[in-house]
């Protein structure tokens, strides 16, 4: 059984979330991504999977709306991999690197809590206490 949430894209460019039975925006789709909700976007005209296309639209909005994640140089380098002999390897490398980075970020958040500065401050204070105790012993 496929557990992906189905979002239908109609010829009028509107997106319809079949799980909540209402039209949604790209911002709503972005929220699904941020909530790690698995979904698939299907073009109703030909039943093709257009999930990647919708995700790229969201990335484009993010890149033009605020602090860009990708520099022009980085984008140019990525484009150069298209059609090359290393395209598949590069795609797997990027995906593996992002997976590792996300796991490390999750582990760090779990270890340090929601406020890493507070955790670092506590750690520093504890180290100062240990040093003070050691100095008193000598």
Swiss-Prot record:
Organism: Thiocystis violacea
InterPro entries: PHA_DNA-bd_N, PHA_reg_PhaR, PHB_accumulat
One biological process term in Gene Ontology: regulation of DNA-templated transcription
Protein name per Swiss-Prot or TrEMBL: Uncharacterized protein in phbA 5'region
Coiled-coil positions: none
